[in-house]
């Protein structure tokens, strides 16, 4: 290095370590419409001031590192750095704070959920100055939203494709999830669809195993779809799981589904990865396929209250990356989910514009502009007695998915499907007549069961089944 170069590099540079808050804690900062905003729940190590912890989060997830570097002088840190602009204590929790961080839009690649998450939730979650860190919410500015395709089709286009309006869609996950041959699997699909369901589904871990290779399954399922459509006069579908070990194999499976003429496929978007998921979503839009998203692995990330990432963030990521459906809990079933919290991220999936509402866990107003909405899927431990509550909580623009609640019917799969369809239509009719499903729901189901033996049998089997556990992830 020449003396001249050394002199230029050294101008204004002072080596050493300085507090993050001197650069990255800026309570006077006024956020811009183009900023990506993040709300982090942070638990600093003993002795670490919350301002220093919040600034460290902003620094390590944007331009900062642990020491001063001379190359800071070669760019404009004020333009590119993340800023912790507000900190508030969490009520009822000792040494927990919500840190609000603003990121300039230029830090992120357009149309890339992968890059967005690599930056914001990358290395910072292992930072030693923090005992725990959780990303509670993100505000994605319209200028960044518009760089994404989002869902392949969206709610209205899906309804038009299926020619089904004014009620929740009904589905069923085929069980046992592993071990069936392709022919028996297709038989189970056919029975459910002819009984009145709109969809059946591969479980998340059904890929291409020795007992049932993917192509065999796709062929038998397609036969079941077309046979049930011919019998019922309704459009039917099965979420054939295209998730695979490579993106190339995933797209090959999607191409097979397209050639068979089926309406929908499925992807495990967390285990499959955001890059693969976005590629698949683009393929689905180009080729007229609906895309169902399973959230397998989400609880590893979102279950703990003080560390990880809330599902509302993963839900927003799925809308950006692309999916027409995504699993969203049930509130009343066997899986985790508080009602107000669930309603918050369900609205974030479906609506064009969502106001800030901390009572529902919504930290920021979100404008999705032209991005299509996503149907929330209620699935996991639900049965006919849950139908009134599910109809009230999720409304018409949803998929209510009964696996054991269909296949566990004492008379078989088709009667199980009939029971769910009758219960759903009874609840929709009662709601449309002005009845209060929260108060009269059980009576609505009992009345419908008087003229439906299939529903009456289902009511008897599941009359005592409840999943009454305390929710871990509360507001």
UniProtKB/Swiss-Prot annotation:
Keyword Lyase tagged: yes
Any one of the GO CC terms: plastid
Residue numbers carrying N6,N6,N6-trimethyllysine: 14
Keywords tagged on the record: Acetylation, Calvin cycle, Carbon dioxide fixation, Lyase, Magnesium, Metal-binding, Methylation, Monooxygenase, Oxidoreductase, Photorespiration, Plastid
Site entry: Transition state stabilizer: 334
Sites where the protein binds Mg(2+): 201, 203-204
UniProt function note: RuBisCO catalyzes two reactions: the carboxylation of D-ribulose 1,5-bisphosphate, the primary event in carbon dioxide fixation, as well as the oxidative fragmentation of the pentose substrate in the photorespiration process. Both reactions occur simultaneously and in competition at the same active site.
Name of this protein: Ribulose bisphosphate carboxylase large chain
């Amino acid at each position: 290095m020449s003396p001249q170069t050394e002199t230029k590099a050294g101008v204004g540079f002072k080596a050493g370590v300085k507090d993050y808050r001197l650069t990255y804690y800026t309570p006077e900062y006024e956020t811009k419409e183009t900023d990506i905003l993040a709300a982090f729940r942070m638990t600093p190590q003993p002795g670490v001031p919350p301002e220093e912890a919040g600034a460290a989060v902003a620094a390590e997830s944007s331009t900062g590192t642990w020491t001063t570097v001379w190359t800071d002088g070669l760019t404009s840190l004020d333009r590119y750095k993340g800023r912790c602009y507000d900190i508030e204590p969490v009520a009822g929790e000792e040494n927990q704070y919500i840190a609000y961080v603003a990121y300039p839009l230029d830090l992120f690649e357009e149309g890339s959920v992968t890059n967005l998450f690599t930056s914001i939730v990358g290395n910072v979650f292992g930072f030693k100055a923090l005992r725990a860190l959780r990303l509670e919410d993100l505000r994605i500015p319209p200028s960044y939203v518009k760089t994404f395709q989002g869902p392949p089709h969206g709610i209205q286009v899906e309804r038009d494709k299926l020619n089904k309006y004014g009620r929740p869609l009904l589905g069923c996950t085929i069980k046992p999830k592993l071990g069936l041959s392709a022919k028996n699997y297709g038989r189970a699909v056919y029975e459910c669809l002819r009984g009145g369901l709109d969809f059946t589904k591969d479980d998340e871990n059904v890929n291409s195993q020795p007992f049932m290779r993917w192509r065999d399954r796709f062929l038998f399922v397609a036969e079941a779809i077309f046979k049930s459509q011919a019998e019922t006069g309704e459009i039917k579908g099965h979420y054939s799981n295209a998730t695979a070990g490579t993106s190339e194999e995933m797209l090959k499976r999607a191409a097979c589904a397209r050639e068979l003429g089926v309406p929908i496929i499925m992807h495990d978007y967390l285990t499959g990865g955001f890059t693969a998921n976005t590629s698949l979503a683009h393929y689905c839009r180009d080729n007229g396929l609906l895309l169902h998203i399973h959230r397998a692995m989400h609880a590893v990330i979102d279950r703990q209250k003080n560390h990880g990432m809330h599902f509302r963030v993963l839900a927003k990521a799925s809308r950006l990356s692309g999916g027409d459906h995504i699993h969203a809990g049930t509130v009343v079933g066997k899986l985790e989910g508080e009602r107000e919290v669930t309603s918050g991220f369900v609205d974030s999936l479906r609506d064009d514009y969502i106001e800030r509402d901390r009572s529902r866990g919504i930290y920021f107003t979100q404008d999705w502009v032209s991005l299509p909405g996503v149907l929330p899927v209620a699935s996991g431990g639900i049965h006919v007695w849950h139908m009134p509550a599910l109809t009230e909580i999720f409304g018409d623009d949803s998929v209510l998915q009964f696996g054991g609640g269909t296949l566990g019917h004492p008379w078989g799969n088709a009667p199980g499907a009939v029971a769910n369809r009758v219960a759903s239509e009874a609840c929709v009719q009662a709601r449309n007549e002005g009845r209060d499903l929260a108060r009269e729901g059980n009576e609505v189901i009992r009345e419908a069961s008087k003229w439906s033996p299939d529903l009456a049998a289902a009511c008897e089997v599941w009359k005592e089944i409840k999943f009454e556990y305390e929710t871990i992830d509360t507001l």
